[in-house]
């Protein structure tokens, strides 16, 4: 996929395909704006969390408000908030949430797709991509759309992205 517009179209189509539930990390709220109403009309439980409005430890906030929502079929949670969501501390907390999902601590009665839309600071030393290597054999899949995950290009090389991780994810890169 050549650019941001094409990547976002792909992500919108993937969400509207309605395959299970979705956790969508969407800093600018672009995917939420294009899909949430359509999903509501299709009977989805739609939750929108603007992380800029949360206080304290986001992991605790998530556990209190959203931890058990994915046991319902047809659920989508959008995490938006362009300022705070790109913070390394918050990325680390989202990594803990992903850990809980992959370790079976959250009740997933159906397939969950994790989508990351343009998460520009993802690669900065956080082990979030490493967690995705454990995705095979779970009810979770991932679609990543971010320039920081450009696979193995010299000026953009990210040593945390092994072939195993890239093979387990559908990676869309901007050029």
Where are these regions (language model features)?
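P-loop NTPase motor domains
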Residues: 1-144, 149-157, 161-170
């Amino acid at each position: 996929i050549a650019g941001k517009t094409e990547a976002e179209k792909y992500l919108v189509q993937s969400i509207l395909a309605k395959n299970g539930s979705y956790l969508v990390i969407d800093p600018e709220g672009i995917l939420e704006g294009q899909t949430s109403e359509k999903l509501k009309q299709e009977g989805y439980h739609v939750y929108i969390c603007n992380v800029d409005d949360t206080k304290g430890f986001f992991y605790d906030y998530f556990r209190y408000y959203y931890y058990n929502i994915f046991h319902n079929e047809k659920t989508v949670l959008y995490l938006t908030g362009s300022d705070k969501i790109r913070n390394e501390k918050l990325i680390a907390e989202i990594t803990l949430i992903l850990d809980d999902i992959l370790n079976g601590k959250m009740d997933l009665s159906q397939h969950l797709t994790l989508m990351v839309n343009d998460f520009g600071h993802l690669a900065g030393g956080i082990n979030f991509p490493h967690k995705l290597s454990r995705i095979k054999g779970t009810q979770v899949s991932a679609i990543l759309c971010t320039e920081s995950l450009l696979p193995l290009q010299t000026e953009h090389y990210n040593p945390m992205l092994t072939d195993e991780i890239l093979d387990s994810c559908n990676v869309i890169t901007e050029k």
